[in-house]
Regions:
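Chalcogenol-based redox active-site neighborhoods
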Residues: 1-165, 180-186
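A short, charged, Gly/Pro-tolerant segment at domain boundaries
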Residues: 168-180
Length: 186
C-alpha cells in the first residue's frame, strides 16, 4: 500500500478520449488530484460508473482534477481496450481524462490492486487518502454515494488531514499481463 504523504509518482499516459498525453504536471494549479484505477468490464466499476462521472465532473468546478486510469491487460480483456474506453467514457459522460496504462507501470507505481481503487492527493501532490469510493457493492443493496472519497476530498480542500482508517477498495483484481504481476499482488 502506498504510504500516506507519499509524493504522487509521475506518469505520462495517453488519453483515450483525445489525441493527447496527460501528466499530473499538466494541472499545476489543481487544489487536489483524484486517481481512479478503473476498467470497463468489472461489475464493481459498473456499479459506480455514473456516480463517479458526476463526482469527477463536479470536482472540476472546485479545481480538483480526476483521472480515470485503466491498466488492464487488453489482450485477454478486450472490453477494456482504448477504443472501448472511449465508448465507456462517452456513455458515462466523463469530462475528465480516461488514461490507458498499457505497460501497467503506473498501476505498479501507485500500488493499485483492484478496480476501482482510489488515490487522493493534495495540491502538493502528497497522498492524503487511498481506499474505497463507498460501501456499495454489487448485490449488497447499499446506495452508491461516493461518501468515503467525498469526505476525504472535503477534508483536503479544507486543509485538514483525512481521518483514518481508510477503508481499502474492494473490486476486481487488476488484470495483469502474463508475468507482469507486481510483488505486492497475491
Amino acid at each position: 500500500m502506498l504510504p500516506l504523504s507519499t509524493k504522487a509518482p509521475k506518469f505520462s499516459l495517453p488519453n483515450a478520449l483525445e489525441d493527447s498525453t496527460v501528466t499530473l504536471d499538466d494541472f499545476p494549479h489543481a487544489k487536489a488530484y483524484v486517481l481512479a484505477f478503473v476498467c470497463n468490464h468489472c461489475p464493481f466499476v459498473k456499479l459506480i460508473r455514473d456516480h463517479l462521472a458526476d463526482f469527477g465532473n463536479s470536482a472540476l468546478k472546485k479545481d480538483v482534477v480526476t483521472f480515470a486510469i485503466s491498466s488492464n491487460d487488453v489482450e485477454n480483456y478486450p472490453d477494456d481496450s482504448p477504443a472501448k474506453m472511449v465508448i465507456e467514457a462517452k456513455e458515462a459522460g466523463y469530462a475528465f481524462p480516461y488514461l490507458y496504462d498499457e505497460s501497467q507501470e503506473v498501476a505498479k507505481s501507485y500500488k493499485a490492486a483492484c478496480t476501482p481503487d482510489f488515490f487522493l492527493f493534495d495540491s502538493n501532490q502528497r497522498l492524503a487518502y487511498r481506499g474505497q469510493y463507498d460501501d456499495a457493492r454489487p448485490g449488497n443493496g447499499k446506495p452508491v454515494t461516493g461518501n468515503d472519497l467525498q469526505l476525504a476530498l472535503d477534508a483536503v480542500l479544507a486543509g485538514k488531514e483525512v481521518p483514518e482508517p481508510h477503508q481499502p477498495s474492494i473490486g476486481c483484481n487488476i488484470k495483469w499481463k502474463q508475468g507482469n504481476a507486481p510483488d505486492y499482488f497475491g
